[in-house]
A protein has these predicted regions:
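Absolute protein N-terminus
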Residues: 1, 19-20
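Generic hydrophobic, helix-prone segments enriched in Leu/Val/Ile
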Residues: 2, 73-75, 88, 114-118
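N-terminal Sec/ER secretory leader and immediately downstream segment
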Residues: 20-99
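Bacterial N-terminal signal peptides that target proteins for export
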Residues: 1-7
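Mature, soluble, non-transmembrane domains
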Residues: 96-97, 101-217
Length: 224
């Protein structure tokens, strides 16, 4: 499918207008461990963790005047440094670019709102959206796993992590997105094989995931 034409106002605009509570489910997987021992973290923090896939399923809610019930949006992101390194005292990435997959069932207005929602919920992580593509998005959430497929990105996350006492394992990061009660997950599959980010990756079998429900209350804002 052909990417949608990017509108400068979509990518560069200030905070979008939104109204009504938005609730749903979220999952992310990174190319870096989020739960590890200090010995592992100190050796990898500067060199990995520059990419991630984030996915949202909206159960109900209105954003930027658009009802988004049942729609999904996925962002594959890549930066020039570990995306979360600021949390452990490092310098934040100077850029984080995103390829965004929007639900092919959405209208043009809903697609724009889904991109804005992803930018809003990821709290400024994304500095530039380089491609927007409507696709069929799978977001399967079961008692044990969450599986997402969208375009050239996919991830499968097992809920929970198993760990031993070696190297004093601990949680080093927090989710990129707004999440009510985030939980740790074990990434079974995580890849992006598309174009637009000058990077492709596959990073399975890591303690590199977060998941959980998200919700936030609407605020009236004026659109630019």
């Amino acid at each position: 499918m052909k990417p949608l034409a990017l509108l400068p106002a979509l990518v560069l605009a200030a905070s979008p207008a939104w109204a009504g509570p938005v609730v749903g489910q979220y999952v992310e997987a990174r190319t870096a461990e989020v739960f590890a021992g200090g010995c592992i973290m100190s050796s990898e923090a500067e060199t990995i963790g520059r990419q991630a896939v984030m996915a949202w399923r909206v159960d109900s809610g209105v954003y930027d005047g658009q009802t988004l019930d049942g729609l999904r949006v996925v962002a594959a992101v890549s930066g020039d440094r570990n995306l979360g390194i600021r949390e452990i005292g490092g310098e934040a990435p100077s850029f984080v670019r995103a390829v965004v997959y929007v639900d092919e069932r959405a209208t043009d207005g809903q697609r724009r709102a889904l991109v804005g929602l992803a930018q809003e919920l990821s709290r400024g992580l994304i500095t530039e959206v380089v491609q927007i593509t409507p696709v069929a998005i799978r977001f399967d959430d079961t008692a044990e796993t969450i599986a997402v497929e969208a375009g050239q990105s996919q991830l499968t996350v097992k809920k929970g992590v198993e760990h031993g006492p070696a190297c004093g394992a601990m949680k080093w990061f927090t989710p990129f997105s707004v999440v009510d009660s985030p939980a740790l997950g074990t990434t079974l599959a995580h890849e992006f094989s598309g174009r637009g980010l000058d990077a492709r990756w596959s990073a399975p079998n890591r303690k590199s995931a977060f998941f959980g429900a998200f919700s936030f209350e609407a605020e009236a804002r004026s659109s630019n």
